Amino acid sequence: MKDKLVKAIAKDGQVRIIGAITTELVNEGVKLHNCAPTAAAALGRMLTAGALMGTTLKSEKDTLTLQIHGGGIAKGVVVTSYADGHVKGYIGNPTADIEPNSKGKLDVSGIIGKNGNLLVIRDMGLKEPYIGQVPIYTGEIGEDLAYYYTVSEQTPSAVGLGVLVDKDLSIKSAGGFIIQMMPGADEMLADLISYRLEEIPSITEMISKGMTIEEILEYIFEDMDLNILESIVPEYRCDCSREKVERALASIGQKDLKEIYDEGKEEELKCHFCNKAYTFSHDEIGDILESYYNEK
């Protein structure tokens, strides 16, 4: 099933929905970072969440960054997403892996940890980005995001995220949804949706059966006048460049940059999001010193 993200409403706009199949997107990210199974599930859930949430941005220049740091062996997960559905991310420890949990599922909470925070950072080109922060609720990511929406944005929400890792460490299926009740929505409608979400199979199970994202949402919102508003293709894409990495190198400060230059060696920097390596020769480091700090 090809990746696809849709925005929809139901019950005359009382319910707002974003849903996606992200199997290929997650597979790309997991391969880039060479993730162990549990790390793959954690990164995949965050990438899916990022793709869903990024499409709520108003401008193509805006960015949304999700961070979760719970003190666990995953050493945090960071994802940045954009309005067009493209996303990039990394996990601090791609080898993080532990035994399955009591339900026989990959123990994402066990590697994320619960001693920390979930951050949602929206950079809309203003002087300061908007930062929303909540304590980690379960470490399973989906429930943490639902808690964030309810507490930080006062929007009752259900967030479902799933990643099914195959035996060869490829991603068999991945996807998710965000369902939000709009102001003034019928409370009985919210109860009905909650009941249905408890009764349906997991999103990875439905994707594995060959259901499209539209069919999944039609199944959840049967008899609720589901209306698909738009669809896009989400993808994993890193926008790093030599110029951006050069700016990052310059940002370490004049003193540290001068020390690197005085060592007379080349410096290699890797992009966190795609692992691409950028090498700067001794002369190039000198040029950066001169360009940014008028020193060599």
Swiss-Prot record:
Residue pairs linked by disulfide bridges in the UniProt entry: 238-240, 271-274
Keyword Zinc: yes
CDD domains per record: Hsp33
GO cellular component: a single term: cytoplasm
Compartments where located: Cytoplasm
Recorded GO MF terms: protein folding chaperone; unfolded protein binding
Keywords, ordered alphabetically: Chaperone, Cytoplasm, Disulfide bond, Redox-active center, Zinc
Chief place of localization: cytoplasm
UniProt GO BP: protein refolding
PTM entry text: Under oxidizing conditions two disulfide bonds are formed involving the reactive cysteines. Under reducing conditions zinc is bound to the reactive cysteines and the protein is inactive.
Coiled-coil stretches noted in the UniProt entry, renumbered to this chain: none
Transmembrane regions: none
One Pfam family named in its UniProt record: HSP33
Family classification: Belongs to the HSP33 family.
Functional note: Redox regulated molecular chaperone. Protects both thermally unfolding and oxidatively damaged proteins from irreversible aggregation. Plays an important role in the bacterial defense system toward oxidative stress.
Name of the protein in its database record: 33 kDa chaperonin
Organism: Clostridium botulinum (strain 657 / Type Ba4)
Lineage: Bacteria, Bacillati, Bacillota, Clostridia, Eubacteriales
